[in-house]
Structures are given as C-alpha cells and as structure tokens.
Curated annotation (Swiss-Prot):
InterPro entries for the chain: NPM1_C, Nucleoplasmin, Nucleoplasmin_core_dom, Nucleoplasmin_core_dom_sf
Bias-annotated ranges (Polar residues): 202-222
Cross-link entry Glycyl lysine isopeptide (Lys-Gly) (interchain with G-Cter in SUMO1), positions: K32, K248, K257, K267
PTM annotation (N6-succinyllysine): residues: K267
GO CC field: centrosome; cytoplasm; cytosol; focal adhesion; granular component; large ribosomal subunit; membrane; nuclear speck
Natural source organism: Homo sapiens (Human)
Glycyl lysine isopeptide (Lys-Gly) (interchain with G-Cter in SUMO2) crosslink location in chain: K27, K32, K141, K150, K215, K248, K250, K257, K263, K267, K273
Residues covered by region (Interaction with NOP2): 187-215
UniProt disease link: A chromosomal aberration involving NPM1 is found in a form of non-Hodgkin lymphoma. Translocation t(2;5)(p23;q35) with ALK. The resulting chimeric NPM1-ALK protein homodimerize and the kinase becomes constitutively activated. A chromosomal aberration involving NPM1 is found in a form of acute promyelocytic leukemia. Translocation t(5;17)(q32;q11) with RARA.
BP-aspect Gene Ontology terms: cell volume homeostasis; cellular response to UV; cellular senescence; centrosome cycle; chromatin remodeling; DNA repair; intracellular protein transport; macrophage differentiation
Single annotated GO MF: histone binding
Modified residues (Phosphotyrosine): Y67
Biased composition (Basic and acidic residues): 188-200, 223-235
Name this polypeptide is given: Nucleophosmin
Length: 294
C-alpha cells in the first residue's frame, strides 16, 4: 500500500511563465490549454488602461467554469482614465479555459499575470536515477571484501545497540567482582604481614611446646584464591530474549530515528529472530500484527 501511495503522489515541479494580453471593444482573449496531464492555472495581477484609451468607463469581464462545471461571468475591474487607470488584482487565480473581454469601453486594456504549470517529473529522469542507483549498488558489492554481509545496515545497527547494552551490563558485573576481590585481597594481606613480623624465636618456642614443627597459616590466602577461582569458573547466565513490549519500544525508537521495518512477513520474522533472539512463535505473530498496524 505504501508503494502505491508513492506512485500516486509523484513529485511535481512547478513552472511559472509570464502572461499578458490586450483587450479592445472588438477583441476578446481566449486562454486555453491542450489536453495534457499537467495542471495549468492563470494568476492575474494587474489590469490597466492603455496609452490611447479614452476617458470613459471600461469594464473588464472574465468567463470561466464554476465548481459545477457551468460557465460563469465575473467582473474583474472597472477603469476610467481620469479616476482609476489601473487595478491590482493581487493574484486572481482562474483555471482554464478562460475568456477575457472588454464588456464596456473601447480600450485598449492591458492585463498581466502569470501562467502556472505543475509539471510531473519525467519518466526518463526517474529511469536514469534508478540506473544510477543500480550502478552504485553493483560497484559497492564489487568493492566489498569477502562478498560483504547480506544483513541490512539497520538490522546490524539494532543488533549493535543490543550488544552494547549487554557489554555495559557485563562491565558493571566485572567491576563489582573486582571490588569484591580487592576487599578479600586486602583482608588476606593483613594476617600475612602479622606472620612475617613473628620472630623465629616465637616459632621455635611454639614448636618446642607442641613437640612438632609449626607451619605458617595459609588459610586466608588459600580461601581468597579458591573464591577467585570459583568466580572465574562460574559461568554467567546468558541474557534471555527481550519481552514483546521491549521489542516494540526498540522498533518504535528505530522508526522515529528514520529507520524502517521489513514489510514482508518472512523477512520480518527473520529480523526479529536475529536481532532480538525471539523464538516464541506467538510473540512473533503478535509483533507482526503490530507491524502491520503501523
């Protein structure tokens, strides 16, 4: 439906041309155009008496078609050389065919204005633009190493945004783990320093009292290492698929930024699966119905 609307609303290129005519008692002016596809309009600006006009009443009349398609006559200006030799109409627009005549007076009367034409863009120029686009796409494919990626740029952008969010969450988790490990390492260093400060005499005294050699305590250090190894071995829970509402919000944000969503159902389903890791068929159908309602 969107493609058909684009075809109907083809771009128009407005063109303006000067218009002018002379009216006399026995000389009317007929303004008509050929049956072409362009829209024409006559915009009248000024009506003025000529240099040789007599000091008498001149009435200028226009005849055209009304809304119902019936002919209608209207008075444009009433002129007299000693009272009002010229009248400004300020852009009196009439759709052709139009007949301009001098209803009263001998003239001459001069009418000036603009002939407006709304010309559609040439089909040849559109074909040339399409050929240029095709040439650019072909050259881009040839220059891309390794055949290039077939994933559209907008899909890659959405996936990149999600990866950035995941990376931010992982960085936060790693920062928390580093803080915990620093605290444990600080606790481990305190007993180690105490054991270093103990003199050999005390160690010998303890060994004589117990009847066996004393061994330096390595429990805090070993616990810290074991906890750090556990943290390294513990796999992080993979992030599950986004909810339907979150996906709708992200799609809406992408549309507001100037992006677009696939119009074909199969492409849309692949887009949802690849970008949002969604595998629930009911949720995908819900998203497709929402996409069609846009």
């Amino acid at each position: 439906m969107e493609d058909s609307m684009d075809m109907d609303m083809s771009p128009l290129r407005p063109q303006n041309y000067l218009f002018g005519c002379e009216l006399k008692a026995d000389k009317d002016y007929h303004f008509k155009v050929d049956n072409d596809e362009n829209e024409h309009q006559l915009s009248l600006r000024t009506v003025s008496l000529g240099a040789g006009a007599k000091d008498e009443l001149h009435i200028v009349e226009a005849e055209a078609m009304n809304y119902e398609g019936s002919p209608i006559k209207v008075t444009l200006a009433t002129l007299k050389m000693s009272v009002q030799p010229t009248v400004s109409l300020g852009g009196f627009e009439i759709t052709p065919p139009v007949v301009l005549r001098l209803k009263c007076g001998s003239g001459p009367v001069h009418i000036s204005g603009q002939h407006l034409v709304a010309v559609e863009e040439d089909a040849e120029s559109e074909d040339e633009e399409e050929e240029d686009v095709k040439l650019l796409s072909i050259s881009g494919k040839r220059s891309a190493p390794g055949g290039g990626s077939k994933v559209p740029q907008k899909k890659v952008k959405l996936a990149a945004d999600e990866d950035d969010d995941d990376d931010d969450e992982e960085d936060d988790d790693e920062d928390d783990d580093d803080d915990d490990f620093d605290d444990e390492e600080a606790e481990e260093k305190a007993p180690v320093k105490k054991s270093i400060r103990d003199t050999p005499a005390k160690n010998a005294q303890k060994s004589n009292q117990n009847g066996k050699d004393s061994k330096p305590s390595s429990t805090p250090r070993s616990k810290g290492q074991e906890s750090f190894k556990k943290q390294e071995k513990t796999p992080k829970t993979p992030k599950g698929p986004s909810s339907v509402e979150d996906i709708k919000a992200k799609m809406q944000a992408s549309i507001e930024k100037g992006g677009s969503l696939p119009k074909v159902e199969a492409k849309f389903i692949n887009y949802v699966k690849n970008c949002f890791r969604m595998t629930d068929q009911e949720a995908i159908q819900d998203l497709w119905q929402w996409r069609k309602s846009l």
